[in-house]
Amino acid sequence: MFGLSKVLRVGEGRAVKRLHKIADQVIALEEKFANLTDEELKAKTAEFKERIAGGEGLDEIFLEAFATAREASWRVLGQKHYRVQIMGGAALHFGNVAEMRTGEGKTLTCVLPAYLNALEGKGVHVVTVNDYLAKRDAEMVGRVHRYLGLEVGVILSDMRPDERRKAYTADITYGTNNELGFDYLRDNMARSLSDLVQRGHNYAIVDEVDSILIDEARTPLIISGPVDGTSQFYNVFAQIVPRMTKDVHYEVDERKKTVGVKEEGVEYVEDQLGIDNLYAPEHSQLVSYLNNAIKAQELFTRDKDYIVRNGEVMIVDGFTGRVLAGRRYNEGMHQAIEAKERVEIKNENQTLATVTLQNYFRLYTKLAGMTGTAETEAAELNQIYKLDVIAIPTNRPNQREDLTDLVYKTQEAKFAAVVDDIAERTEKGQPVLVGTVSVERSEYLSQLLTKRGIKHNVLNAKHHEQEAQIVAQAGLPGAVTVATNMAGRGTDIVLGGNPEILLDIKLRERGLDPFEDEESYQEAWDAELPAMKQRCEERGDKVREAGGLYVLGTERHESRRIDNQLRGRSARQGDPGSTRFYLSMRDDLMVRFVGPTMENMMNRLNVPDDVPIESKTVTNSIKGAQAQVENQNFEMRKNVLKYDEVMNEQRKVIYSERREILESADISRYIQNMIEETVSAYVDGATANGYVEDWDLDKLWNALEALYDPSINWTDLVEGSEYGKPGELSAEDLRTALVNDAHAEYAKLEEAVSAIGGEAQIRNIERMVLMPVIDTKWREHLYEMDYLKEGIGLRAMAQRDPLVEYQKEGGDMFNGMKDGIKEETVRQLFLLRKQFIKQDAEVAD
């Protein structure tokens, strides 16, 4: 009726107009649904499900379902969707990215499309950036869905498989991208149907979609298993490298994140190890240990790229400042850092299963996302995920003032000015949010603020447990919050304090829980929310008089989008607010891209350290550098996707066949085909030369005897009356005779096992043999594909396209793996046949 599926294919301007019309129609239903009793409103869910069962599509119940969820939100949460939130919800339902400014209520927006799509009973996944937000949204926003009779589940990192399975059977499931992706991988390693937890990939709404689908897309999800033994050379090189000198023994390219060992370095290492030639074949692994030790020393910084917690090296997400729990660098890099930090070196890991987030999210039948800043990555979202980005208008005009960047010569001068600015702002009651690029910088600034006696909260990878409480109070008068990258934090900073979160904290402190005792929680919520809102509003008025939230960035990020996300925390919902970045010539981005030119100019002009400059040249240089880095990162992600596409097609084939085997009660046809194809391959290999005289029959017979005990007489087969003289025996005759013989021998195994445990027993044995073989061969294939990819770049030196070569050789390896699965499965099953024969012989004796 609206041409709904085409809403965003008509140009953004016309799309927004259509979304406005949809919002008008939903709002027009407001009075009708407000007049319904609680029972009548709740009954709408059953009515919609009946209509869907009767053949109506989601688009036909769309307006009424949105109106139902909107009214339920008002009754349960005391919040009614604004026009722009209805528009955002519609954009999400159509499978697009809704770009909504910070503070416009993305979490509430999500209620509408989640409810509508859950009515089909196929499951809706709402994807957040961390466990806390998944749990918070499932509890808080999930109250609306539970009120309407839907089940809401949440996936958390510490959950058992049975808890996960129950959560996935819910109508709406909240979880992080990592947990959903790892569950997908674990499901495809399961040995029985009872071990599966997910039930398919129908519709996903990804919150902070740019953070998840772009920032984290370069890092694949990997389930690993330890490789026996840890090399002593990690510690050896962790001691050697600190004694080496940068630019003398080795060189570092910080922009490309690469290192190179110079001749002097090679000689130094050879001397330290007491060897003659570091590059001799027997020492080939040592070069890898050396390079990783140099990278650990020069390119990986503690409290920026990783933290050490409880004797464990934990990776920090460079974009969000969060700890990536369970992630480890591969190819020995993590072990090199562990050696550098002198903590326990854990075994190297072998990949058991892997998928990139790019390919995981492309599994969904329908995908949608929300973010505050997506326009800079709109092309990438469309090109890779086929997602269109539509900018949803703000509910009120934006009043934010973005002040000019201030550039200082040194870091020390910059941070001194930052502290002065913070002190001045807090004195007049203005809250300040300070963005830093690393844990190290946030703690350094915290020390400076403490010395000045300025009270503040720190929000970084080390304190994420207190994140909600800190952010909920970041809008209080005079509050100072130091944050490591506010990207993906997921909680609004409300002037005067966030009443909903502050009340939730208060109720939980009293022992009330929205999951455990929803009725008591809701009763207290309804009674106390008005007073909490009034208290926060009164404090908010004071903050508005002081100028609103002031956002202060202490360094430019390499991505403009991350800078924009930080700025976007200010001036939400039409509030006043301002932002400013403080920079120094020693900042990472300035050192890498702006170079010494500007610093030399400042020195020539005798600019004092504590005097900043405001320069369009610097600002333009930064913008150019950011655009350059963004393009590099985009190319890297595209390249990752191109290579992973090869693995993805192979993964889909192997996982599909594996699932089919898992779900089949009888896999005997698979086994029969494997026997036929394996024996046929042996015959084809031996009879490749057309003439009988040239056949390698000895090789064929040896291979068959290694596979099973042929009952056919070889001499009779070749010279017997059935086929006449050797010259008259065709390869097809040979194949037919041997395949029939193998089938006959396998039938004896089936008969022997069935006599003991019935036919079901042999079918179970077939599955018990086949599944581990598939997993082992797939694991070996992943290792070989990794090895192939590492060296494939060298093909360019021979004027060959590395990607084409990777596709060709990877395809050949995959076919070889599939043949290996068949051969090994048949061999192991025939081993059982031999064991039965042996047992029968022992009984006879």
From Swiss-Prot:
Recorded GO molecular functions are: ATP binding; protein-exporting ATPase activity
Q: What is its EC number?
A: 7.4.2.8
Please name the CDD domains in this protein's record. Answer: DEXDc_SecA, SF2_C_secA
Q: Where does ATP bind?
A: Q85, G103, E104, G105, K106, T107, D492
This protein's membrane topology, according to the annotation, is: Peripheral membrane protein
Q: Which SUPFAM superfamilies match?
A: Helical scaffold and wing domains of SecA (SSF81886), P-loop containing nucleoside triphosphate hydrolases (SSF52540), Pre-protein crosslinking domain of SecA (SSF81767)
Cellular location of this protein?
Answer: Cell membrane; Cytoplasm
Annotated Gene Ontology cellular components are: cell envelope Sec protein transport complex; cytosol; plasma membrane
Instruction: Name the chemical reaction catalysed here.
Output: ATP + H2O + cellular proteinSide 1 = ADP + phosphate + cellular proteinSide 2
Q: Which cysteines are joined by disulfide bonds?
A: none
The alphabetized UniProt keywords are: ATP-binding, Cell membrane, Cytoplasm, Membrane, Nucleotide-binding, Protein transport, Translocase, Translocation, Transport
- A Pfam family of the record is SecA_SW
InterPro entries listed in its UniProt record: Helicase_ATP-bd (IPR014001), Helicase_C-like (IPR001650), P-loop_NTPase (IPR027417), SecA (IPR000185), SecA_CS (IPR020937), SecA_DEAD (IPR011115), SecA_motor_DEAD (IPR014018), SecA_preprotein_X-link_dom (IPR011130)
**EC top class named in words:** translocase
For whether the record's keyword set contains Translocase, the answer is: yes
Q: What does this protein do?
A: Part of the Sec protein translocase complex. Interacts with the SecYEG preprotein conducting channel. Has a central role in coupling the hydrolysis of ATP to the transfer of proteins into and across the cell membrane, serving as an ATP-driven molecular motor driving the stepwise translocation of polypeptide chains across the membrane.
Family assignment?
Belongs to the SecA family.
Which HAMAP family does the record match to this protein? SecA
Subunit field text: Monomer and homodimer. Part of the essential Sec protein translocation apparatus which comprises SecA, SecYEG and auxiliary proteins SecDF. Other proteins may also be involved.
Tell me what this protein is called: Protein translocase subunit SecA 1
Native species of this protein? Corynebacterium glutamicum (strain R)
Taxonomic lineage is:
Bacteria, Bacillati, Actinomycetota, Actinomycetes, Mycobacteriales
What gene name is listed for this protein?
A: secA1
